[in-house]
Structure formats: structure tokens, C-alpha cells
């Protein structure tokens, strides 16, 4: 028994104990042999052997202590063993009772047991006890000592020497356990970090932690296992043990009152049993009529909320299920019961008059009806029929009604399984419809917001286009009289004119660079209507205003403006070839005449109506409906291409070069020139003019008939527009070729006073412009001296005539009828004032030059800087 000797004793006592244990074994065997031969009782022999063992132990221990050699005492050879009956096993309760009786016999004082008895008890401690309770809380509450410890060592519980007659203990191991944690209610007087010996048949591992459920023994620090140890790392194991081992935690169960239920046949019903208190967790059992109920096909027992309640559930209740039910809850501290009733209403059957009497089916025929149907036997026809519950139909209640036709009773407190399915389906449909409505609402809101934003952007775009379509300079609106409403987007926008500065009057106008306007027109909020980029090319003589017949004017305007592809198309027709030949002949004749002509000069006033003035460009770019001036002109051989664009690219207009048209002799004359004196003198110039007129105007008669008034009087004004409106007639208040009233004899001052009024009134309405401009032009004209009808006098009468001529020439608008009447009139032409815009003609060039040399350089008028 070296395992016991090396448990917890010091070395000197260990040797003595080992020798005493050996001796006690031999003496106990001899005493048992002696007692077996005698007829005394087993108790007396056990007492004598215990007393002899005690005396022997005392003697041997004294001898061992007195011996100097230190050798272990060896007893004499034991007598020959005799067979003896096996001792009857005793229960633990009997052993504990024997121990208490021995303690009482010893004087009521507890003392250390003898070594022999300790070995006997230690052998008993190795017995395995399977736990009788399922719950860990029950085991903790039942066990006397509950600790958490760590296994430090393991030793086999081997038997004694071979000559020992004692039965070896049950197979197991002795573990040295270090106490790590304890519970106050089940501590057993142990302290933390204390080492105890525990015998257990359960497999243990070294250096592992366990919760031990122990029972104390007579020896201190020696325990036996009451239940198998458990691993504390399990799910809530330590927490469950702490719940039951705390102070005032363990209570007996107490159940709540059970509610009675009432239902129809075939419905789903349940009874609920719930514990209001109880620690450890109680277990539940159901009874009906004193008989315990178990789980079956129609009855189910379920637990919920951590086994705090139990539910008895009937899948399809029957009439025979009605009755009183008892629920019992029990734990280690006690138990409690509660009662409840289940009422089942049978289906009332209303039989028809033809069916006769009916009765319920017997037990063997009750299974004829399914799904909770009630079976009836109808006498007279000997046929079984079924009364089906709500939601089913058919002869045996096999068919199920659609959910939409199943209307449950609103008085029912507990709905069936079918009703729950219908309710779930209804909820799903409601959710689906609600989701669709919400989605449509969101889509509608998004559409409204998008429409509002698009409308706002469209309004801003239109406003931006209106701003881009407005003229870049307000001066353009003053060139054609009164202001007109804003143009539509479809109208061609007015192109900006680059040449804002009038060229110097001292320069001689001979040949100019041809300007081609490329279609680089861009509009932006910062630059409204940018001007086109000019490119220079060779150009013939400057364009002049053509005053011909209405037919020629209309054809020239159409050829100069409307034709888009004449200049580039091929000329294959005979008429085209003939026209080209005529133009070539006229052009060559003009070249010869131009070579013989001396250079001429223009004044600042003549530049106003030139093709380079802003007034000219305004009349060209303004639509015909809005402009009171219809501009007709002839183009040179090479005509620039105009391309006018608008902010809308679809409204861009491109004007390609027109057909080349040669200049006529009349076109080389200045716009407003001084007429030649009556009766053209002979010379090569007159012959050339007559031949030119006879070629182009064979029906008009000879050249001299065309008169100086036709060239000198009516050429001073622009032709009227054939598209003019009647409202603009009020601006044409002066008549140019009308003969003036006969002069009356008056003084110089009176004549000036009387004639100043109507002239000024007329000048105030020249072309719809301001009167100050007319006055400025009049002053500039009055400063420069001129001659009327070839005379160079500067008298007061000539000044009055100059004022009258100014009133006539300052208005550039003249109707076509007046122009034709002036051309065909036989009366002597009215000669305009001497100070006209152009100071030369073909016949009076030398006269004009001589007058200039005689008077000196004329005083130049101040250039009109007002808006045109």
C-alpha cells in the first residue's frame, strides 16, 4: 500500500505506517482464522481482532523506535491459511452507521481512525456512482461538497501484497486535486489552493480543470465522488451551478393558473402550463383522468422559454379530447400542480326532411370522415354521411375550399391553421399592392420634378436665344426710321459691319480690296453677334447705286441677292452665252472709256450712301418687310460670298456669288452728281454715251432725251422699296424732280425768314431721323460753295436754292413712279443745288476743277458721328 503511505505523511511516519500496515495485515489474518473456528458472532471476533491489532501496532511501534539498527520489524511466518467465507458487501449507509456507532462507543469524541479502517474506507471511495439526476443544478444541489479544481497528479489504486486476503478495491484512480474555486453553500470546509485526494472511476486528465461533486470521508482531505465530474468550459455550466448554490436561490416550483380552452372539432388547440418560480428548473408532466400523457401523433408536448413553460398541443381536437387536464412541475425542493379544462363543441347537424332519422356512427365507422368531419348514419338509405368543418367539403371532407370562399366565424377566439395561412396570404397581397403604389408615387414625383427642371431650362434657353438675337448695337435700329419689333428666330440675323470708321476724304477712291465674309458667326452671352472675318481679293471699281427701270432694278436685285449658284454653274444655253457676250462687250467698252476718264474725288458726304457705309449695310441686312428702302445694285465679275448665321444652325443663310454682271456707263457716275449744263457739247464722251444708251435702251430714244435731270436730279436719291408699307410713306415728304414755285420779289432777309420755316419743317422729317442731323448736313453743305446748273455765283438766292436742294437730296427714298416720270418728262429738269454730295460729272469735270482752283480748297464739313 505504498500509494497511501506516500499521500500526505512525512518520511519517518511513512515508514512506521508502512510497517504497521504490514503487521496489521498478518495479525488480522490470524485473528480472523481463530475467530472462524469459534462459534462466536462476527461482531465479537471483529472487536477482538481490532483490539489485538491495536496492541500489536503499539508494540511494534515501540520496538521500532527502540531499535538502534533501524531495520524494519518482520513478524513471524503466518500460520497456514485456511479457507474462510467471503465477507458480505455492505451498503454505504450501513458503513456510515457503523462509523457513528464506533464514535459513540469511543466516548462521543472523534478520533483518527485506525490505519486498517482508513484503508477500508478508502477502498470504498473508489466505487463509481452514476448520477441519478439529469440536471447539473440537481447534482450540485444534491452533492455535499462542490468545488472546482485542477488535477495535478494521478496514481493507480492498486491492491496490497499478494498475501493479503482483503478484496482489492474497484478499478479506478486516485487524483491529487488543487482547489481553485468553491461555493459557500457547498464548500465542505475547504480553502482555495488546498490539495485534496479524490477517488474517481471517471477518466481524468492531468492539468485539466473539473467541477467535482464530492462526498467527505472520515479522513480529512480525502473525498469520494458523488457524481461524475464535469468540464467547466461547457455552455453555462458554471453559471448554472452558481444559480443553484447561491443564498436563497433554490425554491420550489410554483405554477401559474391555467386557462381553459374551448374549440370546435378539427381545430388546433393547446393548453399552457407556466412556472412562476422554481429553482432548479422544474420538470413538467401532464395527466388526464389520473393517467400520464405522452407524446403521440395527435398530442404533442412542447417546452418554451428555456423550459420555463410547457404546452400540451392538439393538432386536430376531437370530441373525446374534452376533459380536465393536470400539469405537474417538480424539482429537488418540491412540486406543484395546476388544473385546466378543454371544451370541444360538437358540430350540429341539420338533416333534410328526406333523410329520415340519423344517428352517429359507431367507433369503427368514425374514421370514414377525415379533416375533422363528423360521421352520421342515415337510417332508411343505409348510407354514411359527413358534416365537414369550415374550409372543407365533399362526401368524406377531402376537398378543400378556396381561401376566398372560406369565411371564418368572427366569434372564434382561436383561428385554425387554414385561417392563418389565409391571413398570411392577405398580408402579402396588401404589402405587394402597397409597394406598387409607393413605387408609382415615387415615379410620378420624379417625372414632375424632371418636367419642372426641363421647363425651366427651356425658358432659360429661349431667353438666352432672345438675348443673342438682339442687335449688337442700338445704332442699327435708327438707320431705317422708327424702331421695329424684335425679329423672330426664323429671320436672318443682322451681320455686324466691320468698317466703323469712314476713310479719309483726301484719299482717291480707285480700286479697293474685295471683301469676302466667311461664315464664322458666333453668338455668346458675352459677345452678341460677332462680326465676320474679312478676306481680301481683287475687286473692280467701287459699287455704285443703279437707277434703271423697274424691270432692270428688280432683275438686278434678284441676281445680286437671291441667286445662289449662278456664279458657279456652267453656262450652256444660247441665251446665257449671248448675255455673257453682251456683258463682255460692254465691259471692254467701259475699260476703254475708263482709261480716258480722269480720276475723280469724293467728298465726305458722298461716303454716306456708299456701299461701305453703315446705312448701306443696314439696308442690305434688314429684311424687306421691315425696311422702307429696297436696295438694288449690280455686282462685279467677282462677287464675295456672304454667309450669315444665326444662333440656330438650321436658319443659317449662305449667299454664293451671283452671275458676273458688267458695269453700265450710268453706274460709273456718282450717286448724286452735278448735272451737265444744258445742251451737251460735242465730244467723244457724248458719242460714247449715246452709243451706250442706244445699245442698252433702244426704245428710250436718243441719249440727250434722257436729260440732265434724270441723271442729275433723280440719281441723287435711292430708289424706293417695292415692299415698303403704307405706314412708311409719311417719311417720304419731299419730291425731288418737282419744279419749285416761281420766286416772288422779296428782300433778302424776308426771303430767308419766310423760306426757313417750311424747309426746316421738311428737314425735321427727313427719313424719320432727327432734325439736328439735317441741320448739321445743311451747315456742312452751306460751308462748301457750289454752282447750280453750271454757274459759280454765291449769292443769297443761290444759298436758298442750295437749301431747297438739300431738302430734296437728303431724303434717299423715291418712288418708282416718280423716278419714271422724271426720266420720261419733256420739261426741263430741275437742277439741284450746287453743293451736292458728288461734285463731278463726265462733262463738268473741268468746270468743277476750275471753280475749285478759283475759290481755293473747300471747307470740309464735320463728319457726322451720329448713329446711322
UniProtKB/Swiss-Prot annotation:
Location of region: Disordered = 1-114, 469-488, 516-553, 671-690, 720-806, 823-868
- Composition bias (Pro residues) maps to 76-90
Record keyword Signal present: no
Q: Which GO terms describe its cellular component?
A: extracellular space; GABA-ergic synapse; glutamatergic synapse; plasma membrane
Q: Where is the Ig-like C2-type domain?
A: 253-348
Name the glycosylated positions: 33-34, 163, 294, 362
Q: What is known of its domains?
A: The cytoplasmic domain may be involved in the regulation of trafficking and proteolytic processing. Regulation of the proteolytic processing involves initial intracellular domain dimerization. ERBB receptor binding is elicited entirely by the EGF-like domain.
Q: Which PANTHER family match?
A: HEREGULIN-NEUREGULIN FAMILY MEMBER, PRO-NEUREGULIN-2, MEMBRANE-BOUND ISOFORM
The protein here is known as: Pro-neuregulin-2, membrane-bound isoform
Annotated source species:
Rattus norvegicus
